[in-house]
């Protein structure tokens, strides 16, 4: 069986051939594979599972382009199914041709469709749903008919009033025009096509008659009658221009599609019916709107002037004083202001026209009627952008719409203090999974008055979206509503800030709105999660509601096996918002900078950022190297949304979630190690095999085959302490190494693979450095460990009681041959001379399911005890199913030393001993040993000895055997390692040096002390030691202060700042612009030993946990 070659067409043919019951052509299957990468992977895995079938071999063993089915015009399905090739013809093929006489094609004329039945459904003037023929009729109204109606309406109105007097009409005349224009707008019965499409005519009431305009004498009489109450008349007139008919919609279980919008940016369910705003054509609307606006302003100014004159007369104030008081009150904070800022403040100018490509704020208003509880949750399908607006900006070259902000305002009706709760949930309408579709929710009590919520979804969708009527899906529900079913619960308004963008356009959100999204505060509101909820301060109902929204079920297609699907009925979902996850009530007078904004994202499982595969051999043995995945390459190669966000942000400090999907199998006994190597410290030590001392010295996680799919989180800010750039850098390269810790006892049937998924939410980091991983202090060790795992311990299958030990000299540096492997745990323990207390840890039995053992864990000093009567008197513990244990360290000194002396062994001191009380046992034929892995978590109530070194100098490095008199030692802004070709270098070993080795970056100030001894007599020596501080490099750098010490002085003191322009310096030599120091010797051969000592000042910080093999 040779190599298989895959292509989308071959996979589509395979899927179509295996599923004839599902139907569909090869091209349809090919389209599904081209658009769905996960489906393609599923089909590919099915082919790999059936690669021994002859059909699979005939389809996939050919190189792409040479197979029997690669050419869609000449598919040799006979060969694929039977393996038989057609026999070669024995005579010319021309003899087998059959000449067909062309026939005239018969044209079939289809019969006309039957006429539709008479439509007798009663439709109100402003029903929440409109019939199809009504909508079609309204849309077919031509521009000429609109203009003629507008001209007829204006002909009935006076064209101008002298001296800017406001327009005054009788109420009868206004209502006549209202009824007439509303009827003509929505029900144009003059269209003869209605009668043709619906025999008998539409079932509509007759239009109201148009009243003739009154004579001049009647107008004068009406004006004189109303002059006595001019203020009330002016108020009525102003309200008449805005008067809207509001329908009470009884829709507790009705889906309402609001798919179009005309003047407000989106069609309302309860449509405002102002004739002066709706019965105009697009050509005359701007001038007429200005005409109406001027008259409204004049009317308001006159009304205000009358009110101020009355106020001044009643309070003995001047007119100016009354006006100042009125304006001062108007500048105060208004109750119920919208949270959405004005458009001019929300978007920066873009393009040559110096204006944002966006439209109005409010796009949906409706009245909630009935009790939306239980399964009667109100569902509203809502498109925030009208069709006209889409067409307008499509002509300008825009291709997408971005919903930057969405506001929900709930204005409840009823008695104050009513504890009835009401919740509105906003979701993305084209996403079936509620956890992914959720945008935000707002909950309030009806008795608490107006409440507002604002969300920043950043939702972007194409203008070519075929189902634009359901972009936003709103769910409205209550858990304890008790009002009458015909009562109006609340008025709910939904508004958006949006913009239209093209393929070459950036989003142009103003800095104030961007700051509101980042900091989570806007217009005296508090951000909690990704929702801003504002409720009045001092409400009658205390606390916050606990919402429960029932979302109805439906049918769907579900995969039940490889290339197999079935249609199922899904039950409804319950979407609950607990009170602790909502915004709290706030005082509107609180100063916002004093409020602490919660992070917008509280979880990292948002979307897939990267994906990789680890291949595992069928005979995977211990210490086998399986592969390496570069986290940066996983994200960049995946090219998903997170990678685009990463490119935009540049620097990120994410929390990765790793999910390793593998089939569970308890018969192999396999255990792997996933090692996080952020600084390439162990990469070179891993080839075809990997010693566990290397892989367990860096942050790592154990993966057990018997448990199946594994997941963990990698907090990059916690483990590395610095941000991550979207392109590769010289000082860090985060990788995941996969190695086998304990091999499988049974060889599997074939090699296999595990899929590694990387989830993250990549948001911009505000700085390069985060919280330090460690801050140096002589007493930094507190008894807690992280990632402390001992190499595997193996028990032989024997009847003799076995004993295995794990040493407790945890400050000892592990070794692989002659290589020391510095890790942070041993560096921390080496800060003290010894320790005592109770060790808490866990034992992992990594054997197959048919192995078993009974383990007794005990601590002993200087050897082992094989006397059972004495052994069971020691404080110990049996290893239970979860493997956890707590054992007190036994020592005649109450402590055990942190490190060993030369010639000593682990058993000479305190150790953890594991006795196989019973077992191990296994079925006949098994010869492999039983492995266990021990992890130590902490020392409970530690009894720590004296510090190894208190506040004193550490030996850094010794220079000796100089070969040149003119010697210059360049000491960069790093500490741990140093080499030279002109002298001998010996590095000092101490806890501080080990901490430098076990971190990727470090920064702080070191006090340095230089000491040297001479080869010649003291009186005959000459020369000097010069210490110079510099910045940059030798060629273009800066020279700083310098100190010169006579060689007879034998010592000198200085300091060195460890760090670079970024703040912390990696363990590399002159890699970044930083400070460094040069030590110049003019008589180096006369110096026997030059010793440099260092003492870190308080606050010396380390970033990025790792290890250092040397």
Swiss-Prot record:
Query: Which keywords has UniProt assigned to this entry?
Result: Capsid protein, Host cell junction, Host cytoplasm, Host nucleus, Transport, Viral movement protein, Virion
The reply on keyword Transport is yes
Keyword Transport present in the record's keywords: the answer is yes
What cellular component terms from Gene Ontology apply here?
Answer: host cell cytoplasm; host cell nucleus; host cell plasmodesma; viral capsid
For molecular function, the Gene Ontology terms on record are: structural molecule activity
Compartment list: Host cell junction, Host plasmodesma
What Pfam family is a match, any one?
Answer: NeA_P2
Post-translational note: Specific enzymatic cleavages in vivo by the P1 encoded 3C-like protease yield mature proteins.
Q: What more does the record tell us? A: Virions are comprised of 60 copies of the coat protein.
Sequence similarity = Belongs to the nepoviruses RNA2 polyprotein family.
Q: What is this protein called?
A: RNA2 polyprotein
């Amino acid at each position: 069986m040779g190599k298989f070659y895959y292509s989308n067409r071959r996979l589509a043919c395979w899927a179509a051939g295996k599923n004839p019951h599902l139907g569909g052509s090869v091209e349809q299957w090919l389209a599904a594979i081209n658009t769905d990468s996960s489906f393609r992977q599923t089909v590919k895995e099915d082919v790999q599972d059936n690669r021994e079938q002859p059909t699979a071999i005939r389809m996939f063993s050919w190189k792409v382009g040479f197979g029997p089915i690669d050419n869609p015009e000449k598919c040799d399905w006979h060969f694929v199914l039977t393996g038989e090739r057609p026999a070669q013809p024995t005579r010319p093929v021309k003899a087998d041709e059959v000449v067909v006489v062309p026939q005239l094609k018969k044209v079939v004329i289809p019969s006309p469709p039957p006429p539709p039945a008479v439509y007798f459904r009663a439709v109100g003037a402003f029903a929440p749903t409109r019939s199809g023929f009504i909508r079609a009729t309204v849309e077919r109204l031509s521009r000429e008919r609109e203009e003629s109606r507008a001209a007829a309406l204006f002909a009935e109105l006076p064209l101008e009033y002298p001296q800017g007097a406001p327009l005054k009409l009788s109420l009868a005349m206004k209502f006549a025009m209202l009824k007439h224009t509303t009827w003509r707008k929505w029900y144009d019965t003059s269209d003869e096509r209605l009668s043709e499409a619906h025999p008998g005519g539409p079932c509509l009431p007759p239009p109201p008659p148009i009243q003739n305009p009154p004579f001049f004498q009647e107008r004068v009489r009406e004006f004189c009658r109303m002059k006595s109450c001019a203020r009330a008349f002016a108020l009525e007139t102003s309200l008449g221009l805005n008067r809207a008919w509001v329908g009470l919609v009884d829709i507790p279980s009705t889906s309402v599609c609001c798919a179009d919008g005309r003047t407000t940016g989106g069609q309302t369910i309860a449509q405002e019916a102002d004739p002066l705003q709706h019965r105009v054509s697009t050509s005359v609307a701007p001038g007429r709107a200005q005409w109406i606006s001027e008259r409204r302003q004049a009317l308001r100014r006159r009304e205000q002037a009358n009110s101020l004159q009355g106020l001044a007369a009643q309070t003995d104030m001047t007119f100016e004083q009354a006006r100042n008081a009125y304006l001062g009150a108007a500048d105060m904070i208004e109750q119920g202001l919208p949270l959405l800022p004005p458009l001019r403040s929300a978007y920066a100018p873009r393009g040559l026209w110096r204006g944002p490509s966006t439209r109005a704020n409010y796009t949906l208003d409706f009245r909630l009627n009935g009790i939306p509880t239980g399964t009667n949750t109100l569902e509203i399908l809502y498109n925030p952008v009208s069709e006209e607006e889409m067409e307008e900006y499509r002509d300008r070259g825009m291709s997408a719409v971005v919903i930057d902000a969405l506001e929900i305002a709930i204005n409840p009706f009823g008695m104050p203090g009513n504890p009835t709760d009401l919740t509105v949930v906003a979701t993305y309408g084209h996403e079936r999974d509620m956890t992914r579709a959720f945008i935000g929710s707002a909950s309030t009590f009806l008795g608490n008055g107006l409440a507002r919520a604002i969300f920043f979804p950043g939702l972007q969708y194409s203008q070519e979206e075929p189902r634009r009527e359901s972009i936003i899906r709103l769910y409205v529900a209550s858990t304890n509503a008790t009002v009458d079913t015909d009562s109006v619960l609340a008025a709910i308004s939904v508004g958006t800030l949006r913009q239209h963008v093209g393929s070459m356009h950036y989003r142009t959100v103003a800095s104030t709105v961007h700051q509101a999204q980042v900091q989570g505060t806007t217009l005296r509101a508090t951000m909690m999660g990704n929702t801003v909820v504002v409720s009045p301060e001092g409400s009658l109902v205390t606390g916050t509601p606990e919402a429960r929204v029932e979302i109805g079920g439906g049918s769907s297609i579900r995969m039940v096996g490889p290339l197999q699907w079935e249609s199922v009925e899904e039950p409804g979902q319950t979407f609950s918002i607990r009170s602790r996850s909502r915004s709290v009530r706030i005082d509107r007078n609180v100063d916002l900078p004093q409020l602490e904004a919660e992070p917008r994202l509280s979880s990292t499982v948002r979307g897939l950022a990267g994906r990789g595969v680890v291949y595992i051999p069928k005979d995977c043995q211990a210490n086998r190297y399986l592969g390496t995945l570069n986290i940066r390459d996983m994200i960049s190669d995946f090219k998903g949304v997170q990678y685009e966000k990463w490119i935009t942000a540049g620097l990120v400090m994410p929390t990765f979630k790793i999910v390793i999907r593998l089939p569970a199998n308890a018969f192999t006994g396999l255990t792997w190690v996933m090692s996080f190597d952020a600084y390439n410290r162990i990469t070179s030590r891993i080839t075809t095999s990997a010693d566990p001392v290397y892989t367990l010295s860096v942050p790592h996680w154990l993966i057990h085959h018997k448990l199946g799919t594994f997941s963990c989180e990698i907090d990059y800010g916690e483990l590395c302490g610095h941000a991550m750039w979207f392109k590769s850098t010289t000082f860090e390269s985060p990788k995941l190494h996969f190695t086998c810790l304990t091999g499988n006892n049974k060889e599997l049937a074939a090699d296999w693979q595990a899929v590694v998924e990387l989830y993250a939410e990549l948001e911009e980091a505000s700085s390069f450095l985060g919280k330090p991983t460690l801050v140096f202090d002589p007493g930094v060790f507190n008894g807690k460990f992280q990632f402390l795992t001992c190499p595997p311990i193996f028990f032989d299958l024997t009847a003799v009681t076995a004993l295995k030990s794990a040493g407790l000299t945890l400050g000892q540096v592990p070794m692989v041959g002659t290589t020391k492997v510095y890790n942070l745990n041993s560096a921390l323990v080496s800060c003290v001379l010894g320790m005592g207390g109770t060790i808490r840890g866990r034992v992992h039995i990594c054997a197959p399911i048919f192995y078993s053992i009974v383990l007794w864990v005990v601590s002993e000093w200087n050897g082992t005890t094989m006397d059972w009567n004495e052994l069971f008197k020691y404080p110990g513990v049996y290893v239970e199913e979860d493997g956890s244990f707590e054992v007190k360290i036994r020592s005649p000194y109450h402590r055990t030393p942190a490190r060993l002396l030369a010639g000593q062994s682990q058993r000479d001191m305190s150790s953890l001993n594991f006795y196989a009380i019973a077992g191990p046992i296994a079925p006949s034929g098994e010869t492999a040993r039983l492995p266990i892995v021990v992890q130590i978590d902490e020392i409970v109530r530690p009894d720590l000895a004296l510090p190894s070194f208190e506040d004193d100098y550490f030996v850094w490095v010794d220079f000796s055997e100089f070969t040149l008199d003119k010697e210059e030692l360049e000491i960069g802004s790093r500490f741990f390692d140093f080499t030279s070709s002109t002298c001998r270098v010996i590095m000092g070993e101490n806890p501080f040096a080990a901490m430098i080795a076990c971190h990727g970056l470090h920064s702080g100030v070191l006090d340095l002390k230089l000491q040297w001894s001479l080869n010649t007599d003291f009186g005959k020596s000459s020369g000097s030691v010069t210490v110079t501080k510099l910045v940059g490099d030798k060629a273009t750098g800066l020279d700083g202060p310098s100190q010169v010490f006579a060689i007879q002085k034998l010592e000198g003191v200085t300091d060195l700042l460890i760090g670079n322009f970024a703040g912390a310096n990696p363990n590399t030599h002159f890699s970044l612009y930083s400070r460094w120091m040069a030590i110049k010797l003019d008589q180096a051969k006369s110096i026997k030993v030059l010793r440099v000592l260092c003492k870190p000042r308080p606050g010396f910080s380390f970033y990025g946990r790792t290890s250092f093999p040397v």
